[in-house]
Amino acid sequence: MFSPKAQQSHDDFGLKAFELATDLMGDDMAYMTSHFFVYDYLLDNRASSYRRTTTYWQELYAVISGANEVISGLKEQADSGDESVEKMLGQSYTIRAYCYFWLINMYQQPYEWNKDKLGIPIYTESETKLNRVPVGE
């Protein structure tokens, strides 16, 4: 996953930028200077007003939308027995799940104690607008 906006920001270059930022948010990495990703390291900032939050949501949901379009286009052919269709469907489901994995890990409370709390929006069709639902659903 590559960011089409990569030229707009020095620390926004897709999935690898997400991985580096989240590594710095944990306690397993020391940051000795004040350059790229310093606010991720110092603040662990996930507020809605933070630029990185906007980037995560826009980019991951754009990939989810693309995966949903591929899934919608291939569902009719799924029973054809064509292995390449099955592989593309599997890859699209995996990519979509991986994006949701990132969003849930960043913005979700632990499942076991928060089943009734609102979760992230789940889109399984292209061009849908859904309301948030409790995590238990």
Language-model features and meaning:
Residues 4-8, 27, 70-77:
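Generic N-terminal helix/loop capping motif
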Residues 17-36:
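Active-site substrate-recognition loop segments, prototypically the cytochrome P450 B′-helix/B-C loop
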Residues 18-23, 87-88, 94-95, 123:
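Acidic helix-start/capping segments at beta-turn-to-alpha-helix junctions
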